[in-house]
């Protein structure tokens, strides 16, 4: 028997944070590289990552990803002590780092992880500069989404 793939063969997406788009209003998106260890790369290839509660913090002029979980494989990480929730350094250009740091410190924004994916052979993470939504904003989004589905359903039946 063959093993079930963790993600679609043609898909480069490793993990998504769907909750972030609901909880936050995303202003701007950046692509960052990840500083990973060998066992983490193998686990990411198997699709064993979770970024649902992850966010970015800044220390000493560097950006770090907190809260992302990469579950170790049993066979790949038998000789190494694995920490699934360790902080991982993000690889960004200096201008992008300064822009992110300025917006977080001045304007009250936060930086959240949106998705993790493969770009060629490199693991990348899409991060977004976000501001938290209020409860009524979330309700408005739900109403708009429901109206769009109802409208498409009406148009589908009207064209028959």
Swiss-Prot record:
Region ranges (Disordered): 138-160
Compartment annotation: Cytoplasm
GO process terms (BP): trans-translation
SUPFAM superfamilies: Small protein B (SmpB) (SSF74982)
Keyword list, A-Z: Cytoplasm, RNA-binding
Biased composition (Basic and acidic residues): 138-148
Pfam families: SmpB
Gene3D superfamilies: 2.40.280.10
A cellular component annotation (GO) from this entry: cytosol
CDD domains per UniProt: SmpB
Gene Ontology MF terms in the entry: RNA binding
PROSITE patterns xrefs: SSRP
PANTHER family to which the protein is assigned, alphabetical: SSRA-BINDING PROTEIN, TMRNA-BINDING COMPONENT OF TRANS-TRANSLATION TAGGING COMPLEX
Family indicated by similarity: Belongs to the SmpB family.
NCBIfam families registered for this protein in UniProt: PRK05422.1 (NF003843), smpB (TIGR00086)
Biological role: Required for rescue of stalled ribosomes mediated by trans-translation. Binds to transfer-messenger RNA (tmRNA), required for stable association of tmRNA with ribosomes. tmRNA and SmpB together mimic tRNA shape, replacing the anticodon stem-loop with SmpB. tmRNA is encoded by the ssrA gene; the 2 termini fold to resemble tRNA(Ala) and it encodes a 'tag peptide', a short internal open reading frame. During trans-translation Ala-aminoacylated tmRNA acts like a tRNA, entering the A-site of stalled ribosomes, displacing the stalled mRNA.
UniProt protein name: SsrA-binding protein
Provenance organism: Serratia proteamaculans (strain 568)
Highest classification ranks of the organism: Bacteria, Pseudomonadati, Pseudomonadota, Gammaproteobacteria, Enterobacterales
């Amino acid at each position: 028997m063959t093993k079930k793939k963790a993600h679609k063969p043609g898909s480069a997406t490793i993990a998504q944070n769907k909750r972030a788009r609901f909880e936050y209003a995303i202003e701007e998106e950046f692509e960052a590289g990840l500083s990973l260890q060998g066992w983490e790369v193998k686990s990411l290839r198997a699709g064993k990552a979770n970024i649902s509660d992850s966010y970015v913090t800044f220390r000493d002029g560097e950006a770090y990803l907190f809260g992302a979980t990469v579950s170790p494989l049993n066979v790949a990480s038998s000789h190494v002590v694995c920490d699934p929730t360790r902080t991982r350094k993000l690889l960004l250009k200096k201008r992008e780092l300064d822009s992110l740091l300025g917006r977080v410190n001045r304007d009250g924004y936060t930086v959240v992880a949106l998705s993790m994916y493969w770009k060629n052979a490199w693991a990348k993470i899409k991060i977004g500069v976000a501001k938290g939504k209020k409860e009524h904003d979330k309700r408005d989004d739900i109403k708009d989404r429901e109206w769009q589905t109802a409208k498409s359903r009406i148009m589908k039946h009207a064209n028959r």
